[in-house]
């Protein structure tokens, strides 16, 4: 049976992650209160940030920036938006 949690990002009960996605305290916090659905949303956001900002993930400063953005996305006022991103329009 799937592990259900109250998702901090989506504000609803949803299926939780199978394991902590990151090491340390932030990974534990995400595991305990972020759903699979919300995590998938973050992976898309993270990819846009890496691409738009041309982040080199071998650079410790880039990794530190992404960790801060991860925490802001789930538990703060939202992560930075990719500067060149224009949401698709319906129609």
UniProtKB/Swiss-Prot annotation:
One of its GO terms (biological process) is cellular response to oxidative stress. One of its GO terms (molecular function) is iron ion binding. Keywords: Iron. InterPro entries: Fe_traffick_prot_YggX, Fe_traffick_prot_YggX_sf. It comes from the Bacteria. One of its GO terms (cellular component) is cytosol. It holds the Pfam family Iron_traffic. Could be a mediator in iron transactions between iron acquisition and iron-requiring processes, such as synthesis and/or repair of Fe-S clusters in biosynthetic enzymes. Belongs to the Fe(2+)-trafficking protein family. NCBIfam families: PRK05408.1. PANTHER family: FE(2+)-TRAFFICKING PROTEIN-RELATED. This is Probable Fe(2+)-trafficking protein. It comes from Burkholderia cenocepacia (strain HI2424).
């Amino acid at each position: 049976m799937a592990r259900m949690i109250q998702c901090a990002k989506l504000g609803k009960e949803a299926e939780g992650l199978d394991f902590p996605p990151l090491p340390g305290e932030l990974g534990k916090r995400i595991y305990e209160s972020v759903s699979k659905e919300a995590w998938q949303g973050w992976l898309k956001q993270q990819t846009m940030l890496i691409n738009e900002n041309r982040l080199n993930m071998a650079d410790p400063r880039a990794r530190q920036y992404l960790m801060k953005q991860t925490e802001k996305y789930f538990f703060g006022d939202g992560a930075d938006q990719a500067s060149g991103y224009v949401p698709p329009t319906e129609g």
